[in-house]
Amino acid sequence: MLSLRIKAIATSVGAAHKDTDMKTMKTFGNSNSFLLLLLVVLSTIAQAQINSTPTAQQETELAIQLAADRPIAAGQSYWLEELTWMEIRDLIADGATTIIIPTGGIEENGPYLATGKHNLILEATCPEIAEKLGNALCAPIVKFVPEGNIDPPSGSMLFPGTISLTQATYEALLLDISSSLKQSGFTDIVLIGDSGGNQSGMANVAAKLTESWNSESARIHFVREFYDPGWEATEQYTERELGIAESRHDGYHDDIWVTAMMMVTEPEQVRYRQRIEAGLASINGIAIDSLDEAVQLGRKMIEFRAGFTADAIRDVVSN
């Protein structure tokens, strides 16, 4: 590109120098104008050459920077956003080549639960999954997902505070996130979702990238098991192993599993204090008035669900 530009400029100068008739003199005005133009052209060529030469040097400097040692000890986190680029580089080099992309949502969840319900559950669950895998990290939670038609509204969009994406936007977001993580060096990229509306988009993205990547240096896996049968399996575990079962339904988009797991991250996001004050510290017949007991119940649920999901991830990654 640069050589063509220089050649074009040089050709122009040669033609201008050769054309000495009156028409040319009118164009340049006088010999001083011609010399001035020639100086400008030569300066442009010289500057272009200067700008082109540092490419190899810049690549060398970048390679040195990318290989530099950390100046301080590494921090500890399973969340990509809480790590430095050097820490991520070293973790990948040490074998942490699996990255989990968790998808949540912002939606209505009855009178007690914050709209970020799914995101709060993922905050507690994803690091547990990564720890059980032993070679994985968690990408930032994708907090915006399809929640219904925006205008006219449908589904959760009928309630204030819900944020919805179109299916196309959601899938485009996941495509770019997944491709970015592949570029970083992760070889197994895992999609999980805590909500039913997230599942088809993740399946579509996994299918598209599986075809386009063709297993060249990374693979993408949609692990539906986190949601289905992950939720149902967790409910069965709670009933059979812990002896806790709902005795009624209060009519809300809420249950003991959601509530207890949210409380592990932040009890106030289920309005624990306000419910205690109002005498409404229960859901579907199960009391949550003992904060310690409710949080411990949530931890057991998360432990089970994380183990269930980690097993599913191992299965797909090993195939």
List PLM regions with ranges.
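Bacterial N-terminal signal peptides that target proteins for export
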Residues: I6, K23-L35
